[in-house]
């Protein structure tokens, strides 16, 4: 009976831990992701969800997700493009010189 309970315990732990491990394996790499298609957001600028999928623009600003990035790019007079996926790095004045 002790063998059975240890086997059930191991299976229970596996069922709890497996989803946590497998979700990270499905995340797309920053290097393999393509630039967002801003034409998708053209008809509804600034009507964006609050999901976090950060984008760094060439203007050095971080945008929370592709919708906000594209809305700012298409709806403002500023000229900037897609830099990379993820937050922009903040540089100190000492690092720039």
UniProtKB/Swiss-Prot annotation:
<feature type="signal peptide">
    <location>
        <begin position="1"/>
        <end position="26"/>
    </location>
</feature>
<keyword id="KW-1015">Disulfide bond</keyword>
<feature type="domain" description="Kazal-like">
    <location>
        <begin position="32"/>
        <end position="90"/>
    </location>
</feature>
<feature type="disulfide bond">
    <location>
        <begin position="56"/>
        <end position="88"/>
    </location>
</feature>
<feature type="disulfide bond">
    <location>
        <begin position="38"/>
        <end position="70"/>
    </location>
</feature>
<keyword id="KW-0722">Serine protease inhibitor</keyword>
<feature type="disulfide bond">
    <location>
        <begin position="48"/>
        <end position="67"/>
    </location>
</feature>
<keyword id="KW-0646">Protease inhibitor</keyword>
<dbReference type="GO" id="GO:0004867">
    <property type="term" value="F:serine-type endopeptidase inhibitor activity"/>
</dbReference>
<keyword id="KW-0964">Secreted</keyword>
<keyword id="KW-0732">Signal</keyword>
<dbReference type="InterPro" id="IPR036058">
    <property type="entry name" value="Kazal_dom_sf"/>
</dbReference>
<comment type="function">
    <text>Inhibits acrosin.</text>
</comment>
<feature type="site" description="Reactive bond">
    <location>
        <begin position="50"/>
        <end position="51"/>
    </location>
</feature>
<dbReference type="InterPro" id="IPR002350">
    <property type="entry name" value="Kazal_dom"/>
</dbReference>
<dbReference type="GO" id="GO:0005576">
    <property type="term" value="C:extracellular region"/>
</dbReference>
<dbReference type="Pfam" id="PF00050">
    <property type="entry name" value="Kazal_1"/>
</dbReference>
<protein>
    <recommendedName>
        <fullName>Sperm-associated acrosin inhibitor</fullName>
    </recommendedName>
</protein>
